[in-house]
């Protein structure tokens, strides 16, 4: 199911909506955890009012303007971190938010919601601006899973809700696990 092939930079250096759909079923690896990506959201450029880069370049959003394949981790509601992966060409601010994960190592229930996911994996601000294309400790691996998914409006935002840029698996990831 999981290969040892880390997704290369050119995987992320494509249109964000393409990357978002293709991240579903891939394996996120962080420290001793690995799991199937089950839900993501796309945030694309300064014309997207829900994108953190909508108001331009800042210290916080600088990573979004950088090379694709880097992590963008930020703090919300005074209690949760969120993990994004930068997409598109350098200079164009875009990223995919990782919203859901089915943990395989250790085998656990689905981690739904970006804050819960980061809390369980212990992803914090110190993991911001990490190159996910070089280290087997924090990366996304290729997999042979090609899940069916649905696109819906993004959730938990006040602007840009009309965009169907949330990608979610149609079936449980348990369906993808080997039996026995």
From Swiss-Prot:
EC number: 3.2.2.-
Keyword Nucleotidyltransferase attributed: no
Protein origin, superkingdom: Bacteria
An individual GO BP term: base-excision repair
SUPFAM superfamilies membership: FMT C-terminal domain-like
Class of enzymatic activity (EC top level): hydrolase
Keywords annotated in UniProt: DNA damage, DNA repair, Hydrolase
Cross-referenced InterPro entries: Formyl_transferase-like_C_sf, MPG, MPG_sf
Pfam families linked to this entry: Pur_DNA_glyco
Keyword DNA-binding: no
Molecular function in Gene Ontology: alkylbase DNA N-glycosylase activity; DNA binding
PANTHER family referenced in this protein's UniProt entry, alphabetically: DNA-3-METHYLADENINE GLYCOSYLASE (PTHR10429:SF0)
Family indicated by similarity: Belongs to the DNA glycosylase MPG family.
Protein name (record): Putative 3-methyladenine DNA glycosylase
Organism (species): Wolbachia pipientis wMel
